[in-house]
Amino acid sequence: MQIINTIAHETIWGGEKLTPYTDVKSNKIGHLYSLVSNGEYESKILNGKYRGQLFKQYFDENKKRLNLNNYQEFPFVLALVDASDDLSLQVHPNDKIAKELEKTDFGKNESWYFIDAPKSGKIYAGCKAKTAEELKEKVSNGEYEAIIDYLEVTNGDYVYIEAGTMHAMAAGSFVYEIEENCNATYRVYDFDRVDVHGNKRPLQTENALKAIDVNKKAKAQKYNEEKVERLYSTKLFRNISSYTNNSETLECLTIIEGEDIIENYKIQKGTTIVLEPKETVELNNIDFIVSRPII
C-alpha cells in the first residue's frame, strides 16, 4: 500500500475549498493533484518500502509485475478541482491531433464527478457551430456566445468529456477529475480576464480549431455503477470501513469525504492510496473513488 502526497496548483480561477487540505495558504487553488506523473508535476510516495520515491519510478520498476507493461507512462492523472470562476473555453486533442501537434501517443479524454455542481447548474460542453468553417468564422469574429453549448449538471453527476469536445467547467464546480495523461490543452476563449499583472492568458486558437470536433457532445449520467472508459475505470464507494483490491493491477483510492490516520499519515479529502492486487486497507467510514488502469 502506497500513500501519495498531494500537490496544490494555484490558478486564476481557483478557490478556497481545497486550502484546508494542503500546506499552501492560498485562496486560488484550482487543482489538488492526488496522483500525477506528467513531467511538470510528479507525485511522491510517503510510506513503506518505496517511501521518498517518485511514483514514476515505482511505476517504471513495477509495471510489468502489475500487468501494465503496455503503458509507457502511467495512463491517467487524478485531482480534485475547485472552480470559483469559469475555466477557459478549451479543447483537448484526440490521438491523431496529439501525434501531429504534440508528438505524443495519446490525446486526452477525461471524466468529472460533481461533488458540487456549478452555481448556474450548467457547464460549457459542446459546440453550436454546424461545421468547422462556421466555427472558424465565429471565433475569428469573436462571436463566442454563438458557438458555446451548455450541459445541465447536478450534484452527483458523472460527465465524460471526450477529446475534441469544446468545454469548460463553470463557477462553483467542485469536482473529482480523472484525465488521460496528456498535457495538451488548447484555449479558445478566456472571457477576456487578466491576471494580477493585468495580462491575459495566451490562447491557442489555431491548434484549438484543429482539435475541435463540432459533432462532439457530452452527457450527464448518474454515478451509481462502475464507469469504464478507454484507459481507466472508476467507481464510487460510500461509508466504507474496509476495501480489498481484487483486480489484477493496481487500484487508486481517492478520498472525497472523511479522514483517518494510516501508518501515522493523515488521510483526508484529496489523498490517494495505491493498492496492489490483494492488498486491503482499513478505513474509518470513508467516501472514495476507485480508479484503475484498463489492462
Residue ranges of predicted features:
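An exposed, glycine/acidic-rich loop-and-rim segment of catalytic or binding clefts
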Residues: 138-147, 158-160, 166-216
